């Protein structure tokens, strides 16, 4: 990670939809500095960067990953690209925060974890529903064989 113990981590966001805005705000509230944004459309990314106060727009994920000053990449893109993007981010030796769902199948999820472990970076998936009572009940049902 590029951030020293005295500096906040630098973050880039992949995704310009509603959840991208949430990730920008959450990163800032956690003390990170949001330095860049990439989206599926350069025009939309520029408009969102201006609205969200993000200083740099990258043309694509590859350009973002070439930046040595980015410590963490938040993936807030469409679900079907989470796995390929998270693996690319980990391979670039940047930490990954991935919106749910982590992946569309268990093999892809395993590949994401393997890539992060091989690169020595953190991979986290946002899943705040795990604290909901209904999720605890479903988990208990699964463990008991009821599901």
Residues of each region from the PLM?
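N-terminal Rossmann-like dinucleotide-binding module
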Residues: 1-52
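Aromatic/hydrophobic pocket-lining residues that form π-stacking "cages" and hydrophobic walls in ligand
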Residues: 23, 45, 85, 112, ...
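Short alpha-helical
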Residues: 18, 43-44, 80-83, 104, ...
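A broad helix-preferring feature
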Residues: 15-24, 65-73, 119-121
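Beta-loop-alpha module in the N-terminal Rossmann-like domain of NAD(P)-dependent dehydrogenases
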Residues: 52-115
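Structural detector of well-ordered beta-strand residues that form the stable sheet scaffold
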Residues: 35, 58, 97, 122-124
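Structured helix-beta-strand junction loops
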Residues: 30, 92, 118-119
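A contiguous active-site-proximal alpha/beta segment in oxidoreductase catalytic domains
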Residues: 103-147
């Amino acid at each position: 990670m590029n951030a020293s113990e005295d500096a906040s981590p630098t973050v880039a966001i992949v995704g310009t939809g509603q959840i991208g805005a949430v990730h920008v705000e959450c990163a800032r509230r956690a003390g990170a500095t949001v330095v860049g944004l990439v989206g599926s459309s350069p025009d939309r990314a520029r408009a969102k960067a201006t609205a969200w106060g993000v200083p740099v727009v990258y043309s694509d994920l590859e350009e973002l990953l070439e930046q040595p000053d980015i410590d963490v990449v938040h993936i807030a893109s469409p679900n079907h690209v989470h796995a390929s993007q998270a693996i690319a981010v980990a391979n670039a030796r940047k930490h990954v925060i991935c919106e749910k769902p982590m992946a569309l199948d268990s093999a892809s999820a395993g590949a994401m974890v393997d890539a992060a472990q091989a690169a020595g970076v953190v991979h986290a998936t946002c899943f705040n529903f795990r604290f909901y009572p209904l999720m605890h009940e479903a988990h208990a049902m699964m463990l008991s064989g009821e599901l």
